[in-house]
Design a protein with these regions (language model features):
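Positively charged n-region of N-terminal signal peptides that target proteins for export
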Residues: 1-4
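Bacterial N-terminal signal peptides
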Residues: 6-15
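Sequence-structural signature of mature extracellular/luminal beta-sheet repeat domains
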Residues: 17-336
Length: 336
């Protein structure tokens, strides 16, 4: 823990975050690489790797919503061909947004919108790999800010002991965020019982503006993609603030393996961060709190994962919607 607090309050100036000349260990992005089960890939905000190396991704039913669709929006991909092996979750979701595969291979999905008839949406659902519903959190079609409701859950992740963390607050309104919007992280035990929560609208430590994605490192620290505030916030699992990082862009999604952090930036622009970052994927060392590589992509997505073969994949929610493949070029990566 000593190394954690050594970097807890480090915020690097933009001059230290130069993107020109930083190593890029991947080849040119291959957009619309995969073929979905629905025939035409819809918006995708999530892509995840399971415990056996399997890759799952979100396909919003060939559109940007699954309301009224009979397609299964959670797709397992064959990395050799880019084709769908199977799809699950048909009829369960309206706006599948956050995706997580736990240590047993079960698939977790957050649903960020309400169906037209008000009967579905705004829940977190755990599915077996075959699509059986194992658990749901939240009340279908009902917004709220108490312990049993969500306003717009954006992501979910589970700890090794089974505890569940949910980012609730898929909205980014600047420069002012209405006080009645949920901008929080909620924690539940493995049975779905509420434990605690933290966060509120704002830009100070432990405050959020669109907590868009979650990650856990090897030491159990929780990473929150505080996208509307152009930063990553790090906490212990009880909600105690540990660090603020601004050297990994305006993050929409994370992939963490060992000491490596991959943070995908789908949202940076002159409008929301003048003179700042470009869109793409930041890669770096967690222990050194340092961005060491950058993969530029003006069509970067909101989810990112690295497959067992070393290739990286992104989930893209806008044109060109679908899955992007970034082929690994190991010889080009430089370590410091």
């Amino acid at each position: 823990m000593k190394s954690v607090f050594a970097f807890a309050f480090v915020c690097l100036p933009l001059a230290a975050l130069a993107q020109d000349g930083i190593p890029n260990p991947y080849g040119a992005p291959q957009h619309q690489w995969a073929s979905p089960a629905s025939g035409a890939w819809g918006s995708s905000a999530g892509i995840e790797r399971g415990p056996r190396g399997e890759i799952w991704a979100i396909d919003r039913c060939g559109a940007n919503s699954c309301d009224g669709s009979d397609h299964g929006p959670i797709v397992q991909l064959d990395l050799a061909t880019g084709k769908a092996i199977k799809s699950i979750g048909a009829g369960l979701f309206v706006f599948p947004h956050g995706l997580h595969v736990d240590r047993r291979g079960n698939v977790w999905v957050t649903d960020g919108a309400i169906s037209k008839d008000g009967s579905k949406g705004l829940q977190v659902t755990q599915l077996s790999p075959d699509g059986k519903v194992l658990m749901t959190l939240g009340v279908a079609g009902q917004r709220g800010n108490d312990e049993t409701h969500f306003q717009s859950p954006s992501d979910v992740i589970t700890a090794p002991n089974g505890d569940i963390f949910v980012a609730d607050g898929h909205a980014a309104i600047q420069p002012f965020i209405p006080a009645n919007l949920n901008m929080r992280v909620m924690k539940f035990d493995s049975q779905g019982r509420f434990i605690t929560q933290w966060g509120k609208p704002g830009a100070r430590y432990s405050e959020f503006n669109n907590p868009h994605a979650l990650g856990l490192d090897s030491k159990g620290r929780l990473y929150v993609a505080d996208r509307g505030n152009n930063r990553t916030q790090i906490f212990d699992q009880g909600g105690k603030f540990v660090a603020e990082w601004k050297q990994f862009g305006r993050p929409s999604g994370f992939y963490i393996t060992g000491d490596r952090l991959y943070a995908i930036d789908a949202d940076s622009s002159e409008a929301n961060h003048p003179g700042g970052w470009k869109k793409g994927v930041w890669i770096g060392s967690i222990s050194e709190a340092k961005a060491e590589a950058f993969v530029p992509d003006e069509q970067a997505g909101e989810g990112v994962v690295v497959a067992p073969d070393g290739n990286m994949y992104g989930a893209v929610n806008v044109v060109p919607r679908g899955i992007t493949k970034y082929p690994k070029q190991a010889s080009r990566e430089k370590r410091s």
